[in-house]
């Protein structure tokens, strides 16, 4: 599986890449939201993981472009601190396939990476 991770948090990147290594999933980590759609297409990503702790993400635009512009379905999972209720709600409204707290995400990241 190919996955793209959008996060500027090096600890998040490290943990997700470690989980990817265990599941033989290639993880392309990005810290620039402007590169997400292009990178998902380049690596033929099946999964996009979005860290909602990042500032200035136009998630509605990213989700819309990925859902409309690719022949391959990209599952979009957004995660963030449980105290950021507005960001979690906005991710749901934007059309993410799954939205979860950071704790839920890290508890299930290996399962997410195997499909």
Per-range role (PLM):
Residues 1-10:
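Conserved acidic segment of CheY-like receiver
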Residues 8, 79-82:
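Conserved active-site segment of CheY-like receiver
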Residues 24-32:
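Short hydrophobic/Thr-rich beta-strand motif most characteristic of the beta2 strand and flanking loop
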Residues 32-47:
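Acidic, metal-coordinating helix/loop segments flanking the phosphotransfer/catalytic sites
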Residues 50-66:
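Conserved phosphotransfer microenvironments
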Residues 65-78:
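Short beta-strand/loop segments at the ligand-binding rim of alpha/beta enzyme cores
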Residues 83-97:
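Alpha4 helix (beta4-alpha4-beta5 surface) of REC/receiver domains from two-component response regulators
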Residues 95-107:
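Output/docking surface of receiver
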